[in-house]
């Protein structure tokens, strides 16, 4: 990345933040992890290619630190927005090469419908995600962390987790086990963040429809049954 390129990237972000401030926004979700790659210097995953045109390419500055500083200058909170379970399609994963989590921590990754995903049913998945979260929360003056795609993929009935289900389900149905897997990741990360910095907010982006009601059908697209999220349960437990 050239000095001119760095300056342009920073100017574009500053322009966005100025517009948000003028519109009275008080919180910015800055994308920090995409699909197995990141937008800050990490010891765990490579830089996203959007910054330099090359996977793992150092942009010459720390985009997350810059974003946090500029948000705070404007009196706005900055939350690290992290995509969690999906790792991208086969082409994207191949572009990461040996730096991909699918190569480094194979046991927690599964291919499904031409894409790769972290496996919520593997106990080490929450540990891996917590390593990424810890890296961000410990190193940066972040105000919150926000989790996207913390769920099973669409059309998940055939998701390849039979081995883990047999090993870890302990008598639960497949639906309940999967739902518990997602809730355990939420719980584990929430408690981990609060143990490090109690003031850092933890939020998740669930599917907008919780489940069907007697009057309204979700037409097969809801949090509880389709992708195994239980946001009402999270709120009731106080882990959101």
Located regions from the model:
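Active-site-adjacent "subsite" loops/lids of carbohydrate-active enzymes
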Residues: 1-11, 68-69, 79-139, 226-229, ...
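The substrate-binding groove and active-site-proximal loops of carbohydrate-active enzymes
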Residues: 1-7, 45-61, 112-130, 170-182, ...
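Aromatic- and glycine-enriched glycan-recognition loops and surfaces
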Residues: 4-23, 50-74, 180-191
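Catalytic domains of carbohydrate-active enzymes, especially glycoside hydrolases
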Residues: 11-38, 139-144, 233, 237-240
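Aromatic-lined carbohydrate-binding/catalytic grooves of carbohydrate-active enzymes
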Residues: 23-59
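Glycine-rich, aromatic-flanked loop segments that form ligand/cofactor-binding clefts
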Residues: 25-33, 60-110, 146-149, 186-203
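Aromatic- and acidic-residue-enriched segments that line the glycan-binding/catalytic groove
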Residues: 40-52, 86-113, 150-170, 215-222
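Active-site neighborhood of glycoside hydrolase catalytic domains
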Residues: 124-134, 138-240
């Amino acid at each position: 990345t050239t000095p001119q390129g760095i300056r342009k990237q920073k100017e574009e972000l500053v322009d966005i933040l100025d517009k948000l401030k003028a519109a009275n926004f008080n919180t910015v979700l800055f994308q920090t992890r995409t699909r197995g790659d990141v937008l800050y210097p990490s010891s765990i995953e490579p830089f996203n290619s959007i910054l330099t045109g090359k996977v793992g390419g150092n942009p010459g500055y720390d985009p997350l630190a810059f974003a946090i500083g500029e948000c705070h200058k404007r009196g706005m909170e900055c939350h690290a927005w992290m995509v969690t379970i999906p790792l991208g399609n086969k082409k994207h994963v191949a572009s990461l090469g040996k730096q991909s989590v699918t190569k480094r921590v194979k046991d927690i990754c599964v291919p499904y419908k031409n894409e790769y995903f972290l496996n919520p049913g593997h106990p080490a998945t929450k540990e891996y995600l917590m390593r990424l979260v810890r890296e961000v929360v410990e190193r940066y003056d972040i105000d919150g962390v926000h989790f996207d795609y913390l769920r099973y993929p669409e059309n998940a009935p055939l998701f390849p987790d039979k081995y883990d289900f047999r090993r870890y389900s302990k008598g639960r149905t497949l639906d309940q086990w999967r739902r518990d897997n997602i809730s355990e990741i939420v719980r584990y990360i929430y408690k981990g963040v609060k143990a490090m910095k109690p003031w850092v907010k933890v939020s998740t982006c669930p599917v907008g429809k919780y489940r069907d009601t007697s009057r309204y059908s979700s037409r097969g697209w809801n949090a509880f049954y389709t992708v195994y999220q239980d946001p009402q349960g999270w709120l009731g437990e106080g882990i959101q």
